[in-house]
Design a protein with these regions (language model features):
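Rossmann-fold NAD(P)-binding glycine/threonine-rich loop
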Residues: 52-62, 71-111
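Residue-level detector of anion-binding/catalytic polar loops
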Residues: 65, 91, 155
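Hydrophobic alpha-helix position signal
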Residues: 2-4, 59, 85, 135, ...
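General beta-strand structural signal in soluble alpha/beta enzymes
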Residues: 26-27, 44, 67-69, 92-96, ...
């Protein structure tokens, strides 16, 4: 409702897991979304490589612009998905996949247009940074710092992507691909 009222965006469908409760916009069938001629943009907020990669690919092939926050699917399939988007003349937007609330991807694209990027430095994972800070400054052990990060909402209930380095690896692949 906020998107419709404040931005003029009409939400047409919400894809849900099979068997989950739903409302009037809910569908279990992705084909219903990409075959709707009123849908111009598909927004992907799934986690993991599949089925997100397939959905992004199918949406682009169906002539829909795509916005995704899914760094795993994008990092694993960057060239393929960007290639389809370029071939179809469609935007594939992924600012939300890296940098949280800062416009990292857009600024990286701008910098790459005017200069050769030879290195990048920064904090790529807030959860890991929080844990390391707690361990360094307060002498906490890893598990204690992780539990605090989870209690504060900085770490997911399943922090595997953060503490296993997968989140950083995906952001690094995307950033390097853009640069």
């Amino acid at each position: 409702q906020l998107a419709e009222r404040d931005c003029g965006i009409e939400l047409r469908h919400i894809l849900r897991r099979p068997g989950k409760a739903g409302g009037p916009l809910m569908t279990e069938h992705f084909a219903e979304i990409i075959n709707d001629p009123e849908v111009d943009v598909v927004v992907d907020v799934l986690a993991g490589i599949e089925p997100s990669r397939t959905y992004i690919r199918e949406a682009l092939l169906a002539g829909k612009a795509v916005v995704t926050a899914n760094k795993a699917a994008l990092a694993a399939n960057y060239e393929e998905l960007l290639g389809i988007a370029h071939a179809k003349g469609l935007p594939l937007l992924f600012e939300a996949s890296c940098g949280g609330g800062i416009p990292w991807i857009e600024n990286l694209k701008k910098a790459a247009r005017i200069d050769r990027i030879e290195s990048m430095h920064g904090i790529l994972n807030g959860t890991g940074n929080f844990i390391l800070d707690r361990m360094d400054r307060f002498g906490m052990d890893f598990d204690e710092a992780l539990k605090e990060a989870q209690a504060l909402g900085y770490a997911e209930a399943d922090p595997t992507a953060d503490i296993g380095g997968f989140d950083v690896a995906n952001k690094a692949v995307i950033s390097a691909s853009v640069a």
